[in-house]
Structure formats: structure tokens, C-alpha cells
């Protein structure tokens, strides 16, 4: 299914995007957003961003394949097998339908956008992986089946979105889609929506903030996204279609189309998730693709759920609990405002920088900005406001301007700094405005803030508004928690955690002073499963939202903790970065932003801190208990989320997941949280570590390459792919730098001690694998060369014996040529083995040449063999010539008068050895003529001399034979 999705997304995305994925030109197309869905649903489709940098179509396919596998795995674990099967079954038709639908929707969507007067702006995002594309494809695929009613209206847009999302989602949706997965029903809609919904208004800002980081986080989300698609089938309403053009290289284009079709066509999760995803999307996207997924998902659950449930007069907690316990209640709630919350958003992320890490950096920083922008733009698009168009353009301009900064810095921090600081403020303002302005459902859907839930929404709204800035840090966490959502409870937990995270980031951004509480939450939550960051935001969000319903919160935490365990590394990254700068290798700017968000969170949720702490403790214990159930039901999700975590943020995630989850995080969190964390994280660590290892080779590498756009993992994956693909050394060196840099950053961080080994293991493992592969190649080359060399020498004698002199001379030159080739190969292999093993992508012909000379000397075939053959041939010729004068003398007049003899000689050599004689045949004419003419005078000597000079005595022999046979 994954591969199919990938193919479909790839096919669909090119159709959707004006530029061929192979075409590198950046295409900025401003298309009015389709604010209205084909039917009752509002379609704010910035999803038609066709900015594609198909720099890495080839890389994309391997990475995408891996991502598909991984996302498929994630989907399998998080979404029920039924959902996955449904998604698989639906996908083929979905993809084909989408391809046609995407075209139609592209046609319609531009019209709708034109009608809506909103610009569908193509934003250049730094996208590392096209896994998102596949994930989005799945989302789109599931979305249509999941929400037939809304999908019926939205299928075309969904098809386009899903195709784009599929491309984008793999890399970007790794985080975002996985987050979406946390919203099983919205997965397609939400993860993409979160990206796109967040990106609708903050499309530009998201690109600013979302470019690298969003995708990095999205990569984790991607893992969740596969699970989400299953839910999306239920909650197809919110569809985010991410199209990543150049995932693998990291300079990939990400097209995200988010259709927030919040109709209750699917489970409550889908509906309210869709709506809340849109709402959360802005902030989630702000937070990052990964966080976007989980934050938006959680936010969506909390805020969108609240907004929708508000609209549907349902408690946010109920939606959350419903989401967590059963999507059906959520769907009922979401049904209330699905149409309003339906916002198709497509953001085409352009990965201008080739390395995934820049994408990661940009994503983190830009995510918050995108979130705010998404909030404003999304709310505008949802509200039907046309005024945001200029703001969107300005945002796009800002993104384009800021893209350089995101792309330039390889470290996530620089990108986050720009988007978090500059875009965060502007985006936050936009988000706040949007949150205030748009309808509740639209607000919740479009706004990053969760304004729909009155109290919670206010908190979330403020958190969401600020969340955009902070989310980038949490975005990493969220993808994992959304990976957890594979199971409904995990989904609910992840949603809650995402919401909390989003809120916390928002509050953090809002107030930088209260870093302790977020830190406490973060650490305690981090302790719990290494999901602490997610849990802590979740705790604060729940403390605010679900203070009364802490049991559901605990359940959510439980669910989250599995996912958080998976997603904790990212969250811990951001939190550790802010608090201790341990896990997050983003630059200081990112850590500052994280600190800010933590402060804001603590300020925003001063009273919630105890609640998060307390919640983390029960959630942790529950996480241990529920985590284990989830391990059963969502172990794969957890594993995938952990894999996502480890892969997306190799430094931070791995530290959090692999080493810091239990020890460092346990130490950091409160004692109770740490105790629970040790409990939960211990089981979850086995899951995360074991699963990470298990998934690492198949999924982790792909995940690292595509999902988390983090340089270390992606570079590892990329380096492995590229090394196998014989990619130039400087690229490998750059990748190695990218891999080493995160490790250094992590080593500086507190959790780095534990994290570094995990992270280093990946580069080391990759190196080992590459070395082993190179050694194997060398062995094969040597063996084949040795075989060839032995065969080639043996062949000449055989030819000599078989064709006597005729074949031998011709074969020997040929054999010599072949031997030369083999000698080059063997020499290269032998020289490589002797001096240095073959290095991936490095081919050294020089030693091969030297070996050729050596082989020639050893075999002496070329100089001596010719002379020997010539001498032998001359002897034969002399004998034959002795006979020839008699026979040929009669024929000699014919030779002189006609060219038949040469022709005959050619014919005869053909009989003897067509290929061998043909080559000398041309000479044979000359030799036959000269020889025969000379033969009259002194046949033997002249014939010998002629043959030696021409080097084709064989020809004469065939001629004589031909004459004999003819005579």
C-alpha cells in the first residue's frame, strides 16, 4: 500500500503541480483559495501550491518508499488493520480518482479560489522528504472513503490534496501526518490540514516557520499520518495533502493541501478533529509538521473538538475522551461543525536547500510562524475573509524572504529563530486576530488558537497564538504522540498532548517568563514516557481544559505516553533545548524560543503546572498500563512514533527516546512523573528502542531520511542511499557534517549522553553498512574480475585452438580489450582492497589502468601472443602458402582481376568465425591481395611478412580453406 500510495502521490502530485517533479524551477502560483468546498464545505485551498523543487525525484522514490513502508507500518499499528486495509483498498482507486480529481480539482479549485478571491499561494518550503506526499495520499485516500458525504464534495480537492499530501506528507507528514495519525479519523484531513490548515493562512508563515522544521517534525507526523489515514477514512473531512517533490535530498517541494472537511462523515475524531485540526493546524503547523500533526491533532481534538463540540454543544473533554476512547462521540461532536471546519489547504513546501537538516531547522522555526499565519489565513479562508489574501501574500513574501534564513542555517535553531521570533510575533498576531475573528468552528479550524473551546479555547487560543512560535519545538514531540494515535486512545491522548503542547508553545511564546512550569511539565512528562513534552503540554492543556476530567486526561496521557514515548524525543528535544538545551540540536535561537514558549506555558498555565505534574504522574502510570495496552494495540504506533522520534530528530529524539526517556527525563521530571516515566518509559523505551531498532533498518532509515527532515537521521538515510547510489563525495561529506553537527549539539545537551549513543549508532551503523556494502562490492568485483581474467586468458587459447590462427588473433585483441576492461575492474577492486576499499560514489580508474598494464605484463598475451600467433600463423601460412601457390596460382588471375577472392576469403572466415574473421576480413582482402600477389613472387616469405604486418594471418587461412573447399 505504501508503495502504491507513493506512486499515486507521485503521479498525482505532478499532475497537480504545474511543474514536473523532475523540473526544478520554483513555481510560485497564486491561485485564489477555494474557500468553498464543492458542496457545503468551505474549501480554503492553498493546497494548490505547486511550488516544486523536484531536485530529488530519484532520492524521493527510495526515501519515499521507505517512508511509505514506515508510514504503512505506523498506519498499521496506529490505525486499525481494517482502516489500513480500507485505506489500501481505497487507495488504488483513490489515487487514480485523485489523479483525475486532482486535475479536476485543480481546475475547480482555482475557480473556487478565484471566486473566493483568496490566493492559493505556492510557498517555497524546505522539504526534505516526500514521504508526506505518500502519507497525504493515504490521507486523501482514506479521507474520501472515510467521509463519503464530505468527501463526495471534497474528493477532487481531496484527491489533489491527498496526492500532494502524499508527496508532502511522507517527509513532512512524517511529523504532520503522524500527528494527523494521532487523530486517526482526521489523519488525512488533519495532518495535512494541520499543515495545510495551519498553512492556509500561515501558508507563507508556515513555509517560513514550516519549511525545514515543519517538515522535520512533519516527518515524525508522517509516521503518525499513516495511522491517521485509517482514521482519516473516518475523518477524511480534514485532509491535508502534502506533496513533497524532493524529499530525500532535503531540498524537496512539499505541497500540502488540507481539506478540513469536518463533516461527521467519519468518526468524531475525523469531524471534530478536522475542525479542530484546522483550528489547531495553524498553531500545530506553527509548532511544526510533527507537532502540527500532534499539536494540531491534540489542539484539534481539544480546540476543534471544543469548537465543534461548542457548536455541537459537546464538552471538549468528551470529544477528547471520545477521541481517545472512541472516535464515534468525537464524530458526533465534529459533525456539528464539520462543514464549517472543512478547510482544504495545500501548502507546497519547497525544499530549496538540498540537505534535510536545513529543512528541519526551517520547519522548527517556521512552524510557529506558519501556525500563526495558518491561524489568520486559515480563519480568513474559513471565515471567507478575503482580506487575508494580501496578508497571505505578505506572508508568502515573508516566507520567501525568510526561507533563505531557514535554508541557510543548517541548524534548526536558525530557522526556528526567524520564524519563531519574527514570524511568530507577526503570525501570532495573525493567529490571535484570526482566533478572535473567525467563527468558532472556523476559528478553531483556521486559527492556531483553540478559541472554540471557551475556557480551553481561550487558553488554547492564546496558547495556539503563541503556540505557533513554540510549536516548532514541540512539533517534534507531537509527531511521535501522533504516531501513538494509531490507537484511538493514543489518538485521543496524542490529540490532547498535541493540544497541550500547542497551548504550551503558544503560552510559551506569549510569556517567556514562565519557563519553569513548561519545563516541569516537560520534564515530568518527558520522564513519563519521553513523551513528557507532549504530556506536559497535554497536562497543562488538560489542566486547563480537562482539569475536571483528569481521568480522561490520564487516559489521554496514557495514550499519549506511548505516543509521547515515541514523540517525547522531539518534545524533549524542544523542552530539553529550552530547559537544558540537551536534546534539541537546533541553534540557540531555537532554544531561546523553546525557553520562551516554556515561560509562556508556565505563565499561561501556572495553575496547570501541578495539574500537568499530577497528570503526568497518573498518565505516566496509566501510560505504563495504557502504554502497554497501547503497546499491544499501538506498540507499532509507539514504535513508529519512537522511530519517528528517533529518526526525525536523531539527536534530540534519539536522546529522548533511546537514552533520555528513562534516565535523563526521569531525572528531569518530578519524582512522581519520573517514577511513572521510568515505569512507562521503561516499557515504552523497550518499545521505542526495540521498535526503533526494528524499524530503524526498514523504517527508521526511511523515517530519518524523510520524516523528520532532521539532518542527522535524514542525512544518515540519505548518506546510505547516496552512498549506494554513488553520490559525489562532497554531498556525502556535507551529510556527514550534518550528521556530526547534531551529535555535537546533542553532546552539549544534558540528554546528549544517552542520546548521542543512539544518534551515533545511526551514523555509525550507516557507515558500517556502507563499508560492508563497499566491501561486498569489492569482493564481487574482485571475484568477477578474477573469473573474467581467468576466462579471458582461457578464451584466447580456446579461440586459438578452435579457430586456429584466425580466431586467436582477432579474439586476442578482443580478449585483450575485454581483459583491459576486466583488468580495470579487477585492478580497481584489487587496488581498492589493497590500498583502500571502494568508497560509495567514488570510482578510481587510475589504479585500474596500472593493473591493466600489470595484467598485460603478466599475461603477455598482447605482445607475445600476437607474435607467437603470427609466427605460428606464419608457419601455417608458409605451409599453406606453399600449397597456395599451387592452388591459388590458378585462382590468382581471379584475385588480380576480381575481388572475389577477398570476398571469398571473407566468406570463408565467416564460416570459420564470423565475428573474428569479419574484423580481419577487411584486412584479409588486403592481405589476400598482397599475399597472393606476393605469393607469386615468394609466397611463403611475403605471405608471412604480410600477415605479420597486417596481423591478420588468420584471414589467409580461411581463404585457403575456402579455395580448397571451392576447388
UniProtKB/Swiss-Prot annotation:
Bilayer topology: Peripheral membrane protein
Disordered: annotated segments = 132-154, 302-336, 432-462, 506-628, 644-685, 786-838, 929-967
From the Swiss-Prot or TrEMBL record, state where the protein is found.
Nucleus; Nucleus envelope; Nucleus, PML body; Cytoplasm, Cytosol
Which GO cellular component terms, listed alphabetically, does the Swiss-Prot or TrEMBL entry include?
cytosol; nuclear envelope; nuclear lumen; nucleus; PML body; sarcolemma
Q: Which residues carry this modification: Phosphoserine?
A: 129, 792
Where is the stretch described as Required for interaction with ISL1?
A: 144-811
Q: Which segments of the protein form a coiled coil according to its record?
A: none
Spans of biased composition, class Polar residues? Answer: 508-523, 558-567, 658-685, 800-811, 938-947
On tissue specificity, the annotation reads: Predominantly expressed in the heart and skeletal muscle, but detected at lower levels in the lung and brain (at protein level). Also detected in smooth muscle, thymus and kidney. In brain, expressed by a subpopulation of cells within the hippocampus and cortex. In heart, expressed by cardiomyocytes. Expression is reduced in hypertrophic hearts at the transcript level. However, expression in hypertrophic hearts induced by transverse aortic constriction do not differ from control at the protein level.
User: Which residues fall in a compositionally biased region of kind Low complexity?
Assistant: 437-455, 528-541, 826-835
Keyword terms of this UniProt record: Cell membrane, Cytoplasm, DNA-binding, Membrane, Nucleus, Phosphoprotein, Ubl conjugation
Q: What induces it?
A: Up-regulated by beta-catenin/CTNNB1 in mesenchymal stem cells (at protein level). This up-regulation may proceed through the down-regulation of UBE3C ubiquitin ligase by CTNNB1.
Q: Pfam families of this UniProt entry?
A: MLIP
> Is Nucleus among this UniProt entry's keywords?
yes
Modifications after synthesis and translation: May be ubiquitinated by UBE3C ubiquitin ligase; ubiquitination is followed by protein degradation.
Instruction: Give a GO biological-process term.
Output: negative regulation of cardiac muscle hypertrophy in response to stress
Residue ranges, compositional bias (Basic and acidic residues) = 543-556, 958-967
InterPro entries for the chain: MLIP
What GO annotations for molecular function exist for this entry?
DNA binding; lamin binding; transcription corepressor activity
Q: How does it assemble?
A: Directly interacts with LMNA. Interacts with ISL1 (via N-terminal domain); the interaction represses ISL1 transactivator activity. Interactions of ISL1 with MLIP1 and GCN5/KAT2A may be mutually exclusive.
- Tell me, in a sentence or two, what this protein's role is: Required for myoblast differentiation into myotubes, possibly acting as a transcriptional regulator of the myogenic program. Required for cardiac adaptation to stress through integrated regulation of the AKT/mTOR pathways and FOXO1. Regulates cardiac homeostasis and plays a role in the protection against cardiac hypertrophy. Binds chromatin. May act as a transcriptional cofactor for ISL1, repressing its transcriptional activity. May also repress MYOCD transcriptional activity.
Name the UniProt record assigns to this protein = Muscular LMNA-interacting protein
- What would be the name of the gene that encodes this protein? Mlip
Amino acid at each position: 500500500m505504501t508503495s502504491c500510495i507513493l506512486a499515486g502521490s507521485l503521479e498525482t502530485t505532478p499532475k497537480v503541480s504545474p511543474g514536473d517533479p523532475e523540473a526544478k524551477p520554483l513555481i510560485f502560483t497564486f491561485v485564489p483559495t477555494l474557500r468553498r468546498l464543492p458542496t457545503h464545505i468551505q474549501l480554503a485551498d492553498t493546497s494548490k501550491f505547486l511550488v516544486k523543487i523536484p531536485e530529488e525525484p530519484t532520492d524521493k522514490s527510495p526515501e519515499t518508499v521507505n517512508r511509505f513502508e514506515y508510514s504503512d507500518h505506523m498506519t498499521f499499528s496506529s490505525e486499525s488493520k481494517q482502516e489500513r486495509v480500507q485505506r489500501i483498498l481505497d487507495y488504488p482507486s483513490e489515487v487514480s480518482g485523485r489523479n483525475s480529481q486532482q486535475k479536476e480539482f485543480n481546475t475547480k479549485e482555482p475557480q473556487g479560489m478565484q471566486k473566493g478571491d483568496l490566493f492559493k499561494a505556492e510557498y517555497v518550503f524546505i522539504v526534505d522528504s516526500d514521504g508526506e506526499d505518500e502519507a497525504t495520499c493515504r490521507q486523501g485516500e482514506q479521507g474520501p472513503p472515510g467521509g463519503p458525504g464530505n468527501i463526495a464534495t471534497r474528493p477532487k480537492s481531496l484527491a489533489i490534496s491527498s496526492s500532494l499530501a502524499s508527496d508532502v506528507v511522507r517527509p513532512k507528514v512524517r511529523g504532520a501526518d503522524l500527528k494527523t495519525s494521532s487523530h486517526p479519523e482526521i489523519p488525512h484531513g488533519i495532518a495535512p490540514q494541520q499543515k495545510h490548515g495551519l498553512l492556509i493562512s500561515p501558508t507563507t508563515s508556515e513555509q517560513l516557520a514550516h519549511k525545514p522544521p515543519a517538515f522535520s517534525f512533519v516527518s515524525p507526523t508522517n509516521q503518525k499520518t499513516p495511522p491517521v489515514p485509517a482514521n482519516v477514512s473516518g475523518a477524511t473531512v480534514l485532509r491535508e495533502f502534502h506533496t513533497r517533490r524532493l524529499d530525500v535530498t532535503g531540498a524537496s517541494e512539499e505541497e500540502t493541501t488540507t481539506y478540513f472537511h469536518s463533516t461527521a462523515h467519519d468518526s468524531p475524531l475525523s469531524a471534530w478533529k478536522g475542525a479542530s485540526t484546522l483550528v489547531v493546524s495553524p498553531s500545530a503547523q506553527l509548532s511544526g509538521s510533527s507537532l502540527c500533526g500532534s499539536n494540531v491533532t491534540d489542539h484539534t481534538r481539544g480546540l476543534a473538538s471544543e469548537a465543534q463540540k461548542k457548536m455541537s454543544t459537546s464538552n471538549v473533554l468528551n470529544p477528547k475522551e471520545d477521541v481517545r476512547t472512541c472516535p464515534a462521540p468525537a464524530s458526533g461532536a465534529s459533525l456539528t461543525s464539520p462543514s464549517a471546519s472543512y478547510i482544504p489547504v495545500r501548502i507546497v513546501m519547497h525544499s530549496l536547500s538540498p540537505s534535510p537538516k536545513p529543512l528541519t531547522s526551517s520547519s522548527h522555526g517556521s512552524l510557529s510562524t506558519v501556525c500563526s499565519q495558518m491561524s489568520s489565513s486559515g480563519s480568513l479562508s474559513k471565515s471567507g475573509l478575503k482580506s487575508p489574501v494580501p496578508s497571505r501574500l505578505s506572508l508568502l513574501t515573508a516566507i520567501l524572504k525568510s526561507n533563505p534564513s531557514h535554508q541557510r542555517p543548517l541548524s534548526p535553531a536558525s530557522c526556528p529563530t526567524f520564524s519563531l521570533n519574527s514570524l511568530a510575533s507577526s503570525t501570532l498576531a495573525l493567529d490571535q486576530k484570526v482566533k478572535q475573528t473567525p467563527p468558532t468552528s472556523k476559528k478553531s479550524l483556521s486559527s492556531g488558537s483553540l478559541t472554540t473551546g471557551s475556557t480551553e479555547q481561550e487558553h488554547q487560543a492564546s496558547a495556539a497564538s503563541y503556540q505557533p512560535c513554540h510549536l516548532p519545538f514541540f512539533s517534534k514531540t507531537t509527531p511521535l504522540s501522533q504516531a501513538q494515535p494509531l490507537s484511538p486512545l493514543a489518538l485521543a491522548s496524542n490529540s490532547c498532548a498535541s493540544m497541550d503542547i500547542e497551548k504550551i508553545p503558544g503560552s510559551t511564546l506569549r510569556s517567556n517568563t514562565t519557563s519553569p512550569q513548561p519545563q516541569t511539565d516537560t520534564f515530568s512528562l518527558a520522564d513519563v514516557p519521553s513523551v513528557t513534552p507532549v504530556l506536559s503540554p497535554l497536562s497543562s492543556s488538560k489542566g486547563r481544559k480537562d482539569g475536571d476530567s483528569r481521568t480522561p486526561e490520564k487516559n489521554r496521557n496514557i495514550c499519549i505516553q506511548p505516543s509521547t514515548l515515541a514523540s517525547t524525543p522531539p518534545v524533549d528535544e524542544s523542552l530539553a533545548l529550552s530547559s537544558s538545551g540537551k536534546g534539541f540540536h537546533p541553534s540557540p535561537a531555537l532554544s531561546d524560543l523553546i525557553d520562551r514558549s516554556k515561560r509562556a506555558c508556565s505563565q499561561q498555565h501556572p495553575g496547570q503546572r501541578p495539574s500537568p505534574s499530577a497528570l503526568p504522574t497518573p498518565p505516566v502510570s496509566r501510560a505504563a498500563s495504557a502504554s502497554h495496552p497501547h503497546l499491544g494495540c499501538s506498540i507499532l504506533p509507539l514504535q513508529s512514533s519512537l522511530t519517528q522520534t528517533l529518526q526525525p530528530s536523531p539527536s534530540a529524539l534519539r536522546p529522548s527516546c533511546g537514552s533520555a526517556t528513562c534516565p535523563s527525563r526521569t531525572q528531569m521530571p518530578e519524582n512522581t512523573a519520573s517514577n511513572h516515566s521510568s515505569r512507562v518509559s521503561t516499557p515504552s523505551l523497550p518499545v521505542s528502542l526495540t521498535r526503533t531498532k526494528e524499524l530503524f533498518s526498514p523504517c527508521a532509515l526511511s523515517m530519518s531520511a524523510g520524516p523528520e527532515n532532521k539532518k542527522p537521521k535524514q542525512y544518515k538515510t540519505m548518506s546510505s542511499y547516496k552512498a549506494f547510489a554513488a553520490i559525489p563525495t562532497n554531498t556525502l561529506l556535507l551529510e556527514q557534517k550534518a550528521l556530526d553537527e547534531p551529535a555535537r549539539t546533542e553532546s552539549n545537551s544534558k540528554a546528549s549522553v544517552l542520546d548521542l549513543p543512539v544518534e551515533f549508532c545511526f551514523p555509525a551503523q550507516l557507515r558500517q553498512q556502507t563499508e560492508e556494502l563497499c566491501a561486498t562490492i569489492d569482493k564481487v568485483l574482485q571475484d568477477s574480475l578474477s573469473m573474467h581474467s581467468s576466462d579471458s586468458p582461457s578464451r584466447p587459447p580456446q579461440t586459438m585452438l578452435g579457430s586456429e590462427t584466425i580466431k586467436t588473433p582477432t579474439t586476442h585483441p578482443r580478449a585483450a580489450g575485454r581483459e583491459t576492461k576486466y583488468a580495470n575492474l579487477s585492478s580497481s577492486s584489487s587496488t581498492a582492497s589493497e590500498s583502500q576499499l571502494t568508497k560509495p560514489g567514488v570510482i578510481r580508474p587510475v589504479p585500474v589502468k596500472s593493473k591493466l598494464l600489470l595484467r598485460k605484463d603478466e599475461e603477455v598475451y598482447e605482445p607475445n601472443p600476437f607474435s607467437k600467433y603470427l609466427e605460428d600463423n606464419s608457419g601455417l601460412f608458409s605451409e599453406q602458402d606453399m600449397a597456395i601457390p599451387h592452388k591459388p596460382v590458378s585462382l590468382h588471375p581471379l584475385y588480380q582481376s576480381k575481388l572475389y577472392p577477398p570476398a571469398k576469403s571473407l566468406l570463408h572466415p565467416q564460416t570459420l568465425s564470423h565475428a573474428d574473421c569479419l574484423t580481419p576480413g577487411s584486412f584479409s582482402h588486403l592481405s589476400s591481395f598482397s599475399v597472393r600477389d606476393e605469393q607469386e613472387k615468394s609466397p611463403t616469405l611475403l605471405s608471412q611478412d604480410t600477415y605479420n604486418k597486417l596481423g591478420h594471418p588468420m584471414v589467409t587461412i580461411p581463404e585457403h580453406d575456402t579455395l580448397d573447399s571451392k576447388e
